[in-house]
Amino acid sequence: MASNTTVPVITPLAHPEGSKLDFGATVSGVDIENLTDRDFAILRTALFTHQVLVIKSQSHVSPRAQYELTQRFDPLAAPLYGHGNTDSGSVGSKSILHPDLKTIPHQPQVQVIGNGFVPTYEGLSNIQLRHPHHRTFHSTSIPASHDLTHTRFYRWHIDAALYGGVARAPPVVTTLLAVKVPQGRRQTCVYDDGTGDELDVPLGTTAFVSGYKMYDILSETQKAFARSTRVEYAPHPYVWMSSAKSRSTGLGLVSEGKEMPMEELPEIEEDRIQILPMCWRNPVTGKLALQVHPSAVRRLHLEDGTVVEDLKEVREIVYGLQRPGIAPGLVYAHDWEEGDLVIFHNRGTLHSVVGAFAESEVRLFRQCNIAGSEFPMGPEEEEKEEELVHAEQEEGVVEVTKQESLPELRMGAVEVGVAA
C-alpha cells in the first residue's frame, strides 16, 4: 500500500529505439483501493497527457474499487455499462458483443472477458470465456496451420454504445485488470492488405493507437475535412453489423450488403441516433484526436450540409483517414502480466483485441467502462469556450486565464463536490 505521503510517479513508456510511439506511461506509488483526491488528480492529468496508463501488481484491486476508479474520471455519469445492453434478451443476444461478456453479479458495471474455462470467479460459476478470433469476423482469414504463430487485429474500435442519445455517450475511460495471463508465445500480427505490414506481438496483447497521432499525420486538407465532418452511427450498431465482415486490418467493414436491414432491427428512435464530431478535443491538452469507430459508421455529415449516404463511400473515406494511423510503428502492443491494471483514454485512443489462443490457454480479465455523462467536445468547442470566457471577462463576470478554461473549472468543481 502506498503511504499518504507518497506522490504517484508517472514515467513515460520506454519504446523501442526508432519507434514513432509517443504515448503511454507507467504509474507507481498509487493505492487504488484508497485513492486520495490528490493522487487521483495526478492520475487524471497523466491519463489525458499520456492516453494509456499501466499500473503493475494490482491483483488485489476489487471489482468495486475498479468501478469507483473508472467512474471517478466522469463523476456525473450514471452507473451504466458503456456498451449498453449485454443481457440475453432479444436485443442483447443479437449483438456481436454478447458472447464475449460475462457480468460480475455484485458489480454489474464490471465485465469478465478472456479465454477458456474458469470454474468460479467473483460470484460467477462454470464460466466459458471466448477470446474473439478473427476467423469469425473477418472476410478472409489466416490459414488454420498458421493459427498459433500468426494473428490479426480483430477489430479496431472505441468502447461505446454509439446509440441511445446522450444517456449512452462514449465512456471517458476504460480500465482493464489482468487476472490470469498465458505466457510464453509471441505471434506475428499481419495486416494482409497488400502492404506487407506486420508486427511482432505478445500473445493476447491489447493493441492501442493514438487518435492524436492519427490526426496529426493527416495532410492539411484531410485535417480540415476531419475537423468539419460529423459521423452518424448506425442505430443498434452491434446488431446492425452482426452479419457483416471486417477488413483484414480490423479497421472497418467490407461492403457486401450484409448489414441487417433497418426494418429488421429492434425499434429505432431517431432522437437516440448518435451523430458525433469526427475529431474529439482533449479536455486537458486541447489537442484533437481523430476518433471514429470505423465498423459502426453509417453516414457522414459534411460542412456544406451534404450527407454522404453511400455506405461503401463512407467506409472508404474513413479508412483513408485512419489507415495511416495503425501503421506498425504507431501501434503500442501491451505485453500483459498478471496484476497489470491499464487505464486508457477511450476518447483519445483506438484499441483492438489481438491473438489466437489454444483451447487450453486460460486468459481472465476484468473490464470496466461507464457511459459518459456528456458527449465529447468537438473541434469547435474550444473556440466557443474561449469566446464565452472573453465575453464574461469584458462584463466582469469571471476572471480566468487561458490555461484555466471553463471546462477545466467545471471538472474541478465536480471532483471537489464528489470528494465532499
From Swiss-Prot:
Quote the catalytic activity from the record. Answer: xanthine + 2-oxoglutarate + O2 = urate + succinate + CO2
Please indicate which superkingdom the organism of origin belongs to: Eukaryota
Q: Which GO terms describe its molecular function?
A: alpha-ketoglutarate-dependent xanthine dioxygenase activity; metal ion binding
Record-given protein name: Alpha-ketoglutarate-dependent xanthine dioxygenase xan-1
Functional description taken from the UniProt entry: Alpha-ketoglutarate-dependent xanthine dioxygenase is a non-heme mononuclear Fe(2+) enzyme that decarboxylates alpha-ketoglutarate to succinate and CO(2) while hydroxylating xanthine to generate uric acid. Allows xanthine utilization as a nitrogen source.
Q: What gene makes this protein? A: xan-1
**Lyase as a keyword?**
no
Q: Which organism is it from?
A: Neurospora crassa (strain ATCC 24698 / 74-OR23-1A / CBS 708.71 / DSM 1257 / FGSC 987)
Which cofactors are required for activity?
A: Fe(2+)
Upper lineage is: Eukaryota, Fungi, Dikarya, Ascomycota, Pezizomycotina
Q: Which residues are recorded as binding 2-oxoglutarate?
A: T206, W336, R366
The note on cofactor binding and number reads: Binds 1 Fe(2+) ion per subunit.
Q: What is its EC number?
A: 1.14.11.48
The main place the protein resides is cytoplasm
- Where found? Cytoplasm, Cytosol
InterPro entries per the UniProt record, alphabetical: TauD-like_sf, TauD/TfdA-like, TfdA_dioxygenase
Provide this UniProt record's keywords sorted from A to Z. Answer: Cytoplasm, Dioxygenase, Iron, Metal-binding, Oxidoreductase
Q: Could you confirm whether the keyword Iron appears in this record?
A: yes
Q: Which GO terms describe its cellular component?
A: cytosol
Residues involved in Fe cation binding: H157, D159, H351
Q: Where does substrate bind?
A: R366
Name the protein family: Belongs to the TfdA dioxygenase family.
Which Pfam families does the record associate with it? Answer: TauD
